[in-house]
């Protein structure tokens, strides 16, 4: 094993699962990942989560975090103001077949999403929809098959608290796109939380640990599982139009034997050192763009 030096070049949160992301300069590192990441989710009448796979227009919904509220904007819609600290009745919802406790955010929020996401790309009706907030008292853990027995908690992510990606991986992918006469894409397609610069493409694939010395304490992230890619990177986040050539180019060189040939891009990661217990008065570690990262590679 050897050590490399990287930098945190971007930090992203996605407050509403499958909606637009927010590029931030700093973020508190909580036991479920970056603060406010995937804290809300859109569900259908059965309580099943809705994503860009069924509703590409979710990519056009832009969240903005304020002191006491989240403000959501979308083309042709009035802004929706969502309280950060209030919710309505408790509900049970489903994420990838897993039942999760949540709170409904009310009729106004539900109608807003129903109106904007009224039908799928194929014309199938989606409504009625609801916006729900993750119940912070509920513990939703990552698969210990991949965490080597470590309990890692999530909110509404697909299964892990963090997604790490190297900036060079995107640059390499864009070189492959342009070589085929296709336009380059931006980082928003791949929805990472932590982007690393100053290292080679896909260094995260071979990293055993990522150590960041924050102002509060040293934290260690462990990449544990390659991130399999579905159709979401095909969705242009600016237009919500589908561009299937993105997946086709990925599949040409990113089939991963660790996941039986699935196409992967980026690594799901957990926090192994530096978290503050939920009942502690200590401040949480704050990740910042520009922080140095010690990358221990196999």
Per-region residue spans from a language model:
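Metal-cofactor-dependent catalytic cores
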Residues: 1-298
């Amino acid at each position: 094993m050897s050590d490399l030096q990287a930098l945190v070049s971007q930090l992203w949160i996605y407050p509403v699962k499958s909606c637009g992301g927010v590029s931030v300069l700093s973020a508190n590192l909580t036991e479920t990942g970056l603060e406010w990441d995937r804290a809300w989710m859109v569900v259908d009448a059965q309580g099943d989560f809705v994503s860009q796979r069924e509703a590409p227009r979710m990519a056009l919904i832009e969240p903005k975090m304020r002191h006491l509220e989240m403000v959501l904007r979308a083309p042709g819609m009035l802004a929706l103001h969502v309280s950060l600290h209030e919710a309505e009745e408790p509900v049970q919802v489903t994420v990838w077949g897993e039942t999760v406790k949540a709170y409904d955010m009310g009729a106004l929020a539900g109608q807003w999403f129903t109106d904007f996401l009224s039908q799928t790309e194929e014309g199938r009706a989606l409504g009625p929809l609801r916006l729900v907030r993750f119940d912070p008292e509920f513990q939703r853990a990552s698969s210990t098959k991949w965490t080597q027995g470590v309990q890692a908690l999530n909110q509404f992510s697909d299964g892990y608290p963090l997604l790490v990606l190297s900036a060079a991986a995107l640059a390499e992918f864009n070189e492959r796109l342009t070589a085929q006469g296709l336009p380059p894409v931006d980082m928003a397609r791949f929805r990472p939380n932590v982007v690393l610069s100053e290292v080679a493409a896909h260094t995260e694939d071979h990293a055993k640990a990522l150590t960041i010395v924050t102002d509060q304490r040293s934290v260690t992230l462990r990449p544990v599982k390659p991130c399999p890619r579905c159709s979401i990177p095909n969705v242009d986040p600016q237009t919500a139009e589908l561009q299937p050539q993105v997946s086709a180019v990925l599949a040409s060189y990113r089939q991963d034997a660790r996941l039986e040939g699935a196409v992967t891009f980026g690594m799901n990661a957990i926090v192994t050192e530096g978290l503050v217990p939920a009942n502690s008065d200590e401040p949480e570690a704050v990740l910042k763009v520009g922080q140095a990262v010690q990358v221990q590679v196999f």
